[in-house]
């Protein structure tokens, strides 16, 4: 490590030998090496002389030829430095990096030099660079903020030796180049023009400047002496002004005392006037409140009489009673200040209101209770003898009750207990009528559907058990079972009649249920979750009412304020309406489900019709929260389960299918799937539930494909390839006919499997009719593979021309045709007539035979060219053989 003395010596040497001659000054130097085993070099920060100093970074190296001689290798402007990396903020670190036109990595021999160099470099960059300045990384902040880190590094040891250099550094660093102003430049130019001789005689110029300076000093002294008298006179004027200001201030103080007394007097007068005005305002407000209370709590005598003895049977009596009840409701819910409620007169009046309310409410309750029971009994005694499939309309009941709607609204607002009791009486009275009508309606619907299937209604519930015991336990339409094992089925016309009647049943239910629901909402004011009035309680229960109101307010407001309370209110209203409708139509859903299930037991395909039809009504409902929509939706859930159960049974029947000894090549589930798919497409073609059916299509077809692969190996008589070929062909034709987009991939798979099975069957059963010829040329190919040329094969003893002619002589045209006839008979036995694939297979065998023939002819021409050797038949003969055999059968 270099000592401090050595550092100073290097700096002095470089300044003297390199920079002094060019007028430059060395600000800082650091001894560095690129690698530890190389010679050191010096990084220097150098500046030119004022007035416009230019600071540069130089790399100095020592000459190898001459000891003590230094050369400048590179120079960079400070704005070329992009960043400086100290590598580590520890003082003992020697490494640092400079990013110039490339990255330079240096190792400083002395950390003090490194510290001083980085500090000086940062200070000069901050002073000289006007644009983007270099970034200093991993350098202690103290180094960058100290004014003179070089002094701190060198210490007192070098103060004596470098005292003169430091003073020069400080003086030159403190110098700032300042340009002359225009005024200074003009005056300097004027001075030089007046003293033109100064260029020739500097001493004369200095003497003239001295004389002018002496004259200016004298003028300044005279000006100071002259201004002294003026200053004394000004001080005298200031003393006079101060005395006058004191007098004026004393006068203002006396005025302020007088105004203070006036202010206190006016404040007292203003306070008295304010109290008088407040008293007058209070009297006016009190009079208004009293008039308001009297007008709000006043009930005319005629209305009091109408409440005591109401006449609810006549229109005029009802009108008067309703008007009196509404006035009473308005008076009891009037907006009165809570303090006024404590007045004895107010409490007495509200007690009288409470008595009138209870008496009138009891009268209304008794009258409406009797009216509900009377209407229910009157309609219940009527005999229903209609044979048409219609649900009776009870709009006459609604017309009878409509005039009493406002009384029910008043009862809900003023006496909730009575209101709930009347609602229960109405539900009990009308529910008996609707139960009777709904049961009769569904019984009549069952009779109309089954009138051609059975002779009496008693057979309806026992139909399934009687059919199973008499004929079969296997439901009609089961895919995995042969048709001759199915139980009795239902004709398509019967299914269509059931679908039409189901639509009529659902259409009849909708207007009746909707009419009753709308009437109940209006009559019982069910679209309002709570009374619209503010208070129905007397002053005796005021404190309890206040607590209840606060709890309602706190519970009704959502913390997030996002409209949740309104949703909660709507949900509560819908719940109350459904509860009332459930009480009126309690048997509707069980009867509907029973009606559907009774026919599903007769024919499982009915579940498909119900699934589609019920979905249409649920999706087309305008009010999805209505009672009937919810009832249909609940029934639809059960129908969907029945539908899934039916499809699951079909899928299970395919997987568990068993073949009998006399089974045909077409598997039962493949044959049955055609009728099943056509029926399902007729039902689901334009339905919103088509996606559900397509999902089951995928499962069923995949199960059928798996079954074909499995059961083709178990077939007792027919070859595996034939079973697969015919069944895949049948499925491909059916899927192409259905044109279901979701089954396109399976249709392509069916076609591929069919072609693979056809190819495998032709390969296995057609084989090679010219077997010995094929074996002969297999030996030829073996010799060629061993290196014998094709043109020299005839010289081999085993493959000579004579041997070839002997083999060809074994296949005359007559024998070949006879072999093909036997093959045709075998194929005819294998294939079934339903699929009509005999000609397709026969044509494929013809193509295979022609391919083998062409191969043999090609081998003969290549290996025995010019020998005039040919088969006894040609391609035209082959075509004739196949055509004659096909026509003869």
Swiss-Prot record:
The exocyst complex is composed of Sec3/Exoc1, Sec5/Exoc2, Sec6/Exoc3, Sec8/Exoc4, Sec10/Exoc5, Sec15/Exoc6, Exo70/Exoc7 and Exo84/Exoc8. The modification Phosphoserine is found at residues 145, 148, 456. The keyword Amino-acid biosynthesis does not apply. This is Exocyst complex component 1. One of its GO terms (cellular component) is plasma membrane. Keywords: Coiled coil, Exocytosis, Phosphoprotein, Protein transport, Transport. InterPro entries: Sec3-PIP2_bind (IPR028258), Sec3_C (IPR048628), Sec3_CC (IPR019160). It comes from the Eukaryota. GO terms for biological process: exocytosis; Golgi to plasma membrane transport; protein transport. Residues 156-269 form a coiled coil. Belongs to the SEC3 family. Component of the exocyst complex involved in the docking of exocytic vesicles with fusion sites on the plasma membrane. The keyword DNA repair does not apply. Pfam families: Sec3-PIP2_bind (PF15277), Sec3_C-term (PF20654), Sec3_CC (PF09763).
């Amino acid at each position: 490590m270099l000592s401090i003395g050595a550092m100073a010596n290097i700096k002095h040497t470089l300044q003297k030998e390199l920079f002094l001659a060019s007028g430059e000054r060395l600000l800082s130097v650091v001894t560095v090496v690129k690698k530890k085993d190389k010679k050191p070099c010096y990084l220097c920060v150098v500046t030119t002389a004022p007035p416009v100093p230019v600071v540069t970074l130089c790399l100095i190296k020592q000459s190898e030829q001459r000891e003590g001689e230094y050369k400048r290798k590179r120079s960079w402007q400070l704005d070329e430095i992009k960043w400086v990396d100290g590598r580590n903020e520890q003082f003992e670190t020697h490494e640092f990096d400079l990013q110039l036109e490339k990255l330079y990595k240096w190792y400083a021999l002395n950390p003090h030099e490194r510290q001083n160099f980085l500090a000086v470099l940062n200070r000069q960059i901050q002073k000289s660079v006007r644009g983007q300045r270099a970034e200093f990384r991993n350098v202690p902040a103290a180094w960058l903020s100290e004014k003179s880190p070089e002094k701190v590094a060198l210490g007192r040891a070098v103060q004596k030796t470098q005292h003169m250099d430091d003073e020069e550094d400080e003086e030159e660093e403190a110098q700032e180049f300042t340009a002359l102003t225009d005024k200074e430049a003009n005056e300097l130019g004027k001075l030089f023009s007046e003293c033109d001789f100064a260029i020739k005689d500097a001493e004369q110029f200095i003497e003239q400047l001295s004389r002018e300076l002496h004259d200016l000093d004298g003028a300044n002294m005279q000006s100071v002496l002259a201004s002294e008298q003026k200053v004394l006179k000004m001080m005298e004027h200031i003393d006079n002004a101060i005395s006058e200001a004191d007098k004026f201030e004393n006068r203002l103080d006396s005025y302020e005392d007088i105004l203070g007394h006036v202010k206190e007097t006016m404040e007292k007068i203003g306070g008295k006037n304010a109290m008088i005005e407040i008293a007058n305002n209070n009297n006016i407000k009190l009079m208004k409140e009293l008039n308001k209370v009297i007008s709000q709590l006043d009930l005319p005598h005629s209305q009091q009489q109408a409440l005591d003895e109401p006449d609810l049977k006549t229109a005029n009596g009802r009108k008067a009673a309703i008007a009196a009840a509404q006035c009473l409701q308005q008076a009891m819910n009037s907006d009165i200040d809570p303090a006024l409620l404590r007045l004895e007169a107010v409490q007495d009046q509200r007690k009288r209101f409470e008595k009138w309310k209870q008496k009138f409410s009891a009268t209304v309750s008794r009258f409406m209770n009797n009216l509900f029971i009377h209407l229910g009994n009157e309609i219940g005694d009527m005999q229903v003898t209609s044979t048409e499939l219609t649900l009776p309309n009870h709009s006459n009941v609604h017309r009878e009750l409509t005039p009493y709607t406002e009384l029910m609204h008043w009862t809900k607002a003023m006496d909730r207990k009575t209101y709930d009791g009347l609602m229960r009486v109405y539900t009990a009275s009308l529910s008996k009528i609707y139960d009777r009508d709904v049961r009769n309606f569904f019984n009549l619907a069952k009779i109309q559907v089954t009138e051609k299937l059975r002779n009496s209604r008693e057979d309806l519930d026992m139909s399934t058990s009687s059919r199973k015991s008499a004929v079969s336990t296997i439901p009609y339409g089961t895919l995995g079972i042969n048709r001759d094992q199915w139980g009795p089925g239902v004709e398509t016309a019967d299914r269509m009649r059931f679908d039409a009647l189901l639509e009529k049943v659902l259409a009849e239910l909708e207007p009746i249920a909707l009419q009753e629901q709308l009437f109940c909402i209006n009559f019982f004011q069910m679209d309002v979750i709570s009374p619209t009035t503010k208070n129905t309680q007397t002053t005796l229960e005021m404190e309890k009412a206040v607590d209840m109101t606060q709890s309602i307010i706190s519970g009704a407001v959502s913390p997030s304020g996002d409209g949740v309370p309104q949703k909660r209110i709507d949900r509560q209203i819908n719940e109350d309406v459904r509860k009332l409708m459930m009480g009126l139509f309690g048997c509707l859903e069980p009867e509907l489900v029973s009606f559907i299930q009774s026919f599903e037991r007769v024919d499982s395909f009915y579940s498909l019709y119900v699934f589609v039809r019920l979905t249409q009504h649920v999706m087309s409902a305008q009010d999805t929260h209505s009672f009937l929509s919810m009832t249909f939706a609940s029934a639809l859930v059960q129908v969907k389960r029945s539908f899934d159960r039916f499809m699951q049974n079909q899928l299970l029947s395919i997987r568990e299918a068993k073949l009998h000894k006399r089974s045909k090549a077409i598997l039962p589930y493949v044959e049955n799937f055609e009728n099943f798919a056509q029926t399902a497409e007729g039902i689901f073609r334009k339905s919103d539930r088509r996606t559900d059916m397509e999902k089951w299509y995928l499962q069923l077809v995949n199960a059928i494909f798996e079954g074909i692969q499995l059961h083709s190996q178990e077939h007792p008589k027919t070859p595996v390839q034939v079973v697969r070929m015919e069944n895949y062909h049948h499925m491909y034709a059916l899927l192409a006919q259905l044109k279901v987009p979701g089954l396109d991939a399976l249709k392509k798979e069916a076609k591929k499997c069919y072609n693979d099975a056809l190819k495998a069957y032709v390969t296995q059963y057609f084989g090679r009719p010219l077997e010995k010829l094929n074996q002969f040329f297999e030996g030829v190919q073996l010799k060629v593979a061993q290196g014998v040329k094709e043109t020299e094969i005839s010289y081999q003893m085993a493959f000579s021309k004579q041997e070839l002619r002997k083999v060809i002589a074994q296949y005359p045209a007559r024998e070949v045709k006879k072999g093909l006839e036997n093959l045709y008979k075998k194929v005819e036995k294998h294939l079934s007539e339903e699929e009509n694939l005999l000609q397709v297979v026969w044509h494929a065998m013809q193509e295979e035979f022609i391919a083998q023939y062409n191969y043999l002819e090609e081998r003969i021409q290549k290996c025995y060219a010019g020998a005039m050797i040919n088969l006894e038949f040609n391609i035209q003969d082959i075509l004739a053989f196949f055509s004659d055999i096909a026509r003869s059968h």
